[in-house]
Swiss-Prot record:
The lineage of its organism: Bacteria, Pseudomonadati, Pseudomonadota, Gammaproteobacteria, Pasteurellales. InterPro entries: LexA, LexA-like, LexA/Signal_pep-like_sf, LexA_DNA-bd_dom, LexA_repressor, Peptidase_S24_LexA, Peptidase_S24_S26A/B/C, WH-like_DNA-bd_sf. The active site is at residues 129, 166. This is LexA repressor. The keyword Transmembrane helix does not apply. SUPFAM superfamilies: LexA/Signal peptidase, Winged helix' DNA-binding domain. One of its GO terms (molecular function) is serine-type endopeptidase activity. It comes from the Bacteria. It comes from Mannheimia succiniciproducens (strain KCTC 0769BP / MBEL55E). Its EC number is 3.4.21.88. It catalyses: Hydrolysis of Ala-|-Gly bond in repressor LexA. Keywords: Autocatalytic cleavage, DNA damage, DNA repair, DNA replication, DNA-binding, Hydrolase, Repressor, SOS response, Transcription, Transcription regulation.
């Protein structure tokens, strides 16, 4: 990847808001939300700032969705630190910690502090169930390990030995894991009947699927 070019103060404000919005809601903001938060006169002004950030290599704009904004990561920031990097999690065995050594397929030179809150591991995305918020097949999802999650956040959950990325809705003892693709029905988990359900963390960012080629 190319190194990130210096941002103007206003561009940095926009970028910081994008990161904050993804951190707190699990998805990018719309142009209208950016305009409202930062005091732009119209969503068109927000669009111009997004285009500027895209030209500088810090975001990617995806067509076809109002929330089609993806943060990109400059791996060169951690290139001189041999110990820097995030583990990539592969297949997970039921009953074992997700970060157990046997689950780690490799380590990627990514600065964990690029994500807020800090990322603890990467998970490869399979399928198109979250495509409407820009999480695509083959992407690497940056995940912050935590059990402290809120309704509406995009989480990484484990059911037996299956790991899934979905938006959380919990009502009492029933958990609904919602896709961001109308072709997929929610996964419904009754916590009283399914003891092998674990929340592994929240999504804090995406590395696009061709960033390492």
């Amino acid at each position: 990847m190319k190194p990130i070019k210096a941002l103007t103060a206003r561009q940095q404000e926009v970028f910081n808001f994008l990161k904050h919005h993804i951190e707190t809601t699990g998805m990018p903001p719309t142009r209208a939300e950016i305009s409202r938060e930062l005091g732009f006169r119209s969503p068109n002004a927000a669009e111009e700032y997004l285009k500027a950030l895209a030209r500088k290599g810090v975001v990617e704009i995806l067509s076809g969705t109002s929330r089609g904004i993806r943060l990109l990561v400059d791996t060169e920031e951690s290139a001189n630190d041999e110990d820097a990097g995030l583990p990539l999690i592969g297949r997970v065995a039921a009953g074992e910690p997700i970060l157990a050594e046997q689950h780690i397929e490799g380590t990627y030179k990514v600065d964990a502090d690029m994500f807020k809150p800090q990322a603890d591991f990467l998970l490869k995305v399979y399928g198109q169930s979250m495509k409407d918020i820009g999480i695509l097949d083959g992407d690497l999802l940056a995940v912050h390990s935590t059990k402290d999650v809120r309704n509406g956040q995009v989480i990484v959950a484990r059911i037996e030995d299956e790991v899934t990325v979905k938006r959380l809705e919990r009502k009492g003892d029933v958990v609904y894991l919602h896709a961001e693709n109308e072709e997929f029905k929610p996964i419904v988990v009754n916590l009283k009947e399914q003891p092998n359900f674990e929340i592994e963390g929240i999504a804090v960012g995406i590395i696009r699927n061709n960033a390492w080629m």
